[in-house]
């Protein structure tokens, strides 16, 4: 009998065990689509990014004009640029939904998978930040200045660290050059980490909405979930095309249509929408070092989530109190995002401070307490 190449070839076997014959829980919902959607996002961003990099010039005197040239003179350059800029927004929408899914259904109890995922989020945030600097518009320049300056809050080595990152005494040509190098490199780091993420996931298998072991009822990934994933791909790519073609500048800042000018500060310096929640937490603390620590903690707190799980149940499916708390947390994050987009004045300052306090309070204090309380309720 002829060997089945798909199951025996050293390379095809890996693909087969990951995407075709993978035993998958029979009851996973649409919330489990976002992992593969993130994979498609990454591929789209790498392809459009490579095409843009062929026409981009990483020099302060040429960067802005090279982006303008791309949009005016390169065949479909305007489309490639709009797909790349809005693809980043879709990437973050998918990753936030993916993390929310993991949080709700207790997927974080696969500790290795979860921790690699948090590292992936941090790498993605770094990639998006350095990428935003490349067009060398006003918001690019001042965003880079403000965020890199935060490192100067580190005691003793801060100022040296910032000047080392800048390659001089301000954000200038060396900064732009190294940011381009980093922006080119990091997506490939993300791709590598993604493989590690998947390797750890396939050690344990996927979680499911009930949060219970599903070994007794698994189905092959293909055709059941491959076809379901293709629906997700279609919906996402249609959304991306619609955004890029109908309102490409909806999520951008008009300030970035002005070339970078170190002598004129924009009236409101703010990051892209996907960083606003963290920016609001940064601004909510009047002390510079305190703000930087809170900013770091707002994302690094994800590493603690597996350690703060007190419930006997894995998923929140049958935990109504935790569900209420979860949706309060989501609402709180939306409030932080809105506050981050507003100027730093009354009443936004106090709203931001309350929302920041509540964010940490819910995750560090209320979730563990409610988990214990629900365990008690099980015994009634």
Swiss-Prot record:
It is found in: Mitochondrion inner membrane. Signal peptide: none annotated. The keyword Repeat does not apply. Heme b b562 binds at residues 84, 183. A ubiquinone binds at residue 202. The chain crosses the membrane at residues 34-54, 78-99, 114-134, 179-199, 227-247, 289-309, 321-341, 348-368. The cytochrome bc1 complex contains 11 subunits: 3 respiratory subunits (MT-CYB, CYC1 and UQCRFS1), 2 core proteins (UQCRC1 and UQCRC2) and 6 low-molecular weight proteins (UQCRH/QCR6, UQCRB/QCR7, UQCRQ/QCR8, UQCR10/QCR9, UQCR11/QCR10 and a cleavage product of UQCRFS1). This cytochrome bc1 complex then forms a dimer. This is Cytochrome b. The gene is MT-CYB.
């Amino acid at each position: 009998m002829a060997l089945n190449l798909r199951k025996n070839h050293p390379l095809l076997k890996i693909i087969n065990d990951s995407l075709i014959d993978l035993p998958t829980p029979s009851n996973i919902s649409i919330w489990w689509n976002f992992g593969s959607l993130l994979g498609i996002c990454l591929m789209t961003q790498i392809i459009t990014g490579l095409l843009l990099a062929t026409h981009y010039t990483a020099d302060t005197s040429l960067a802005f004009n090279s982006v303008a040239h791309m949009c005016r003179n390169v065949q479909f350059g305007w489309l490639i640029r709009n797909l790349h800029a809005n693809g980043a927004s879709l990437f973050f929408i998918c990753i936030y939904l993916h993390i929310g899914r993991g949080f709700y259904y207790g997927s974080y109890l696969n500790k290795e998978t979860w921790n690699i995922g948090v590292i992936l989020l941090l790498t993605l945030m770094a990639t998006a930040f350095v990428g935003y600097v490349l067009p060398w518009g006003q918001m690019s320049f001042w965003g880079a200045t403000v965020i890199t300056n935060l490192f100067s809050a580190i005691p003793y080595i801060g100022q040296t660290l910032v000047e080392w990152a800048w390659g001089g005494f301000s954000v200038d040509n060396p900064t732009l050059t190294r940011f381009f190098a980093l922006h080119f490199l990091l997506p490939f780091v993300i791709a590598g980490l993604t493989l590690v993420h998947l390797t750890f996931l396939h050690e344990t298998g996927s979680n499911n909405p009930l949060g219970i072991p599903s070994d007794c009822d698994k189905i092959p990934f293909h055709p059941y979930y491959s076809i379901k994933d293709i629906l997700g791909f279609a919906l996402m790519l249609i959304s991306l095309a619609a955004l890029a073609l109908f309102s490409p500048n909806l999520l951008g800042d008009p300030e970035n249509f002005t070339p970078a000018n170190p002598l004129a500060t924009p009236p409101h310096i703010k990051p892209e929408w996907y960083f606003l929640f963290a920016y609001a937490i940064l601004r909510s603390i009047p002390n510079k070092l305190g703000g930087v620590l809170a900013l770091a903690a707002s994302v690094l707190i994800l590493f603690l989530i597996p350690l703060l799980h007190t419930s006997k149940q894995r998923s929140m499916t049958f935990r109504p109190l935790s569900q209420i708390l979860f949706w309060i947390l989501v609402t709180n994050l939306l409030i932080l995002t809105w506050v981050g987009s507003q100027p730093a004045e009354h009443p936004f300052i106090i709203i931001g401070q309350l929302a920041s306090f509540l964010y940490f309070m819910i995750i560090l204090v209320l979730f563990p307490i409610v988990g214990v309380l629900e365990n008690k309720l099980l015994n009634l």
